[in-house]
Amino acid sequence: MDQKILNKSLNNLLKNCAELNKNDSLLIISEDSKYGWYDKYISVAVYNYAKKKLGLNTQLLIVGEPENNSKNTIEKILDDYDCAIFFARIGDQERFEKPSSNTKRIMSYVRNIDSLCSSFASTNYLEMNKFKDAINKIIFNADN
């Protein structure tokens, strides 16, 4: 693992994607690694960078596997934070629904440190959005 690339990716996630500032609060929701989906080191790396490097008010919540009512517990505390980053499958349950809180939500599909250090994860999020918008414009303006 290259620490420089890791820091670039962490900054990309927290500053470019989440648009967090020093006075913001962050809840990191991490699925217990015993379920095999997410490596625990990913959420710990984000927590440490957010808290120590960016000075954010940061909390880490470890959750179990998704269940039909598991989102209810999280919904109760989401409004206490400016942003919630999910390293947990539970964050994907409401992908197409209207959010029930004003908290900014980010569902991360990065499952380990290696994928966080990938060229995709370290590429500037804002520039990737410009690229996506350009592609969408071409597609949506096509004649057939």
What is the predicted role of each segment?
Residues 1-144:
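Active-site bordering "gate/hinge" segments
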